[in-house]
Regions:
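Short, conserved beta-strand element in jelly-roll/cupin
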Residues: 1, 72-76, 95-129, 135, ...
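Conserved metal-binding segment of the jelly-roll/cupin
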Residues: 1-8, 12-14, 24, 135-156
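Extracellular structured ligand-interaction cores
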Residues: 6-8, 16-19, 67-72, 100-102, ...
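Short helix/loop capping segments that flank catalytic or ligand/cofactor-binding pockets
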Residues: 11-13, 20, 30-31, 83-84, ...
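Surface-exposed beta-loop interaction hotspot
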Residues: 16-77
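Short, compositionally biased
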Residues: 23, 156-166
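Short edge-strand/loop segments of extracellular domains
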Residues: 25-28, 86, 165-166
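Active-site environment of non-heme Fe oxygenases that use a 2-His-1-carboxylate facial triad
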Residues: 58-66, 81-85, 92-98, 104-110
């Protein structure tokens, strides 16, 4: 369900559920409330070889969402995603757009782990303003304020992430 800024809403569940509330400051674009049905979700395969991953576009670029982009990605064990590395920290369309990004990670089986590196380009001295490599466990959230952000799923552990950008 897409709910624009300033709207009142609530959720009532009859069974246990895992609910993701993805939000960002809106631009006041007047986008109406709407149900995003499974038939409306675009699915695609990105990458080749060990860079193959499976993407479900929930709120993709080009669909009205008042500055919010949401995708789900499944990266099979032994594969990488958000790779080759790319970034969203400059307003330089069409090559790059300025976006902050979060990753909500799940693993199957859940006792597994993956890796994610968030880093910037090196300056003339070789220093980076951001360079963090994290062991990701089931349920972890990673904030990407700037820089590149590739993920690697270890063999035997499929990596799912909900990717939210604004």
């Amino acid at each position: 369900v897409y709910v624009p800024q300033g709207s009142d809403w609530s959720v009532t569940a009859d069974t246990d559920l895992e609910l993701a509330v993805c939000s960002a400051p809106g631009l006041g674009g007047g986008v109406p409330v709407r149900v995003i049905a499974p038939k409306d979700l675009g699915q695609e395969v990105r990458g080749k070889g060990t860079n193959t991953r499976y993407v479900t576009n929930i709120l993709p670029e080009g669909k009205p969402a008042d500055s919010l982009l949401v995708v789900e990605v499944i990266t099979p064990g032994g594969h990488t995603s958000s790779y080759p590395p790319h970034k969203h920290d400059q307003d330089n369309l069409p090559a790059e757009s300025y976006l902050e990004e979060t990753y909500y990670h799940r693993l199957n089986p859940p006792q597994g782990f993956a890796f994610q590196r968030v880093y910037t380009d090196a300056d003339r001295t070789g220093a980076r303003s951001l360079d963090e490599t994290m062991a990701i466990e089931d349920g972890d959230v990673v904030l990407v304020p700037k820089g590149y952000h590739p993920c690697a799923a270890c063999h035997g552990y499929d990596l799912y992430y909900l990717n939210v950008m604004a």
